[in-house]
């Protein structure tokens, strides 16, 4: 019996050896290439530099716009802060002019020294007031002979005149004024009617 066991022993063990040999060996996976997946430090630095430069340019542009807006606001505040006061002073100037216009020409010539001194005093006051307003950017409009401009003039009536182009200012009822680039008060005017067509406004300068 021992012989039979010895005889069959190697043959019994053979299938196990065969099975072990038949099983494929587990293949070792290659290590991942870490160096290929890592970002290039130089490219990262370039991208960061480009982003910072873009932020800097945007900030510089915003600061420049803010500076310009601030300068414009300060200039406007300085130029137009006296607009209300100037408008009130123009009403006083209008009354002085009406007082002077109410004096007949013969009374001016034949008047005594007291009347002449009064007239000179009123005229001097009017000139001084207008000069003071002009120092603060208030300028008088003199549109006589100019083409009517609704931005600067207010038409009060029409004057039939075939010799003057249509819509030409032929009479100023009340002077107009500007402050800076804005109209403080439009000039009240009379415009011509019945004449030839007015020339094109191209190339014309703003009313003085």
From Swiss-Prot:
Region (Disordered): 1-43
Compartment(s) where it occurs, according to its Swiss-Prot or TrEMBL record: Cytoplasm
Molecular function, one GO term: unfolded protein binding
Keywords: Chaperone, Cytoplasm, Stress response
A cellular component term, taken from the record's GO annotations: cytoplasm
GO biological process, one term: protein folding
Top-level lineage group: Bacteria
Pfam families assigned: GrpE (PF01025)
UniProt xrefs under InterPro entries: GrpE, GrpE_coiled_coil, GrpE_head
Subunit and partners: Homodimer.
Family: Belongs to the GrpE family.
Annotated function: Participates actively in the response to hyperosmotic and heat shock by preventing the aggregation of stress-denatured proteins, in association with DnaK and GrpE. It is the nucleotide exchange factor for DnaK and may function as a thermosensor. Unfolded proteins bind initially to DnaJ; upon interaction with the DnaJ-bound protein, DnaK hydrolyzes its bound ATP, resulting in the formation of a stable complex. GrpE releases ADP from DnaK; ATP binding to DnaK triggers the release of the substrate protein, thus completing the reaction cycle.
Name recorded for this polypeptide: Protein GrpE
Gene source species: Sinorhizobium medicae (strain WSM419)
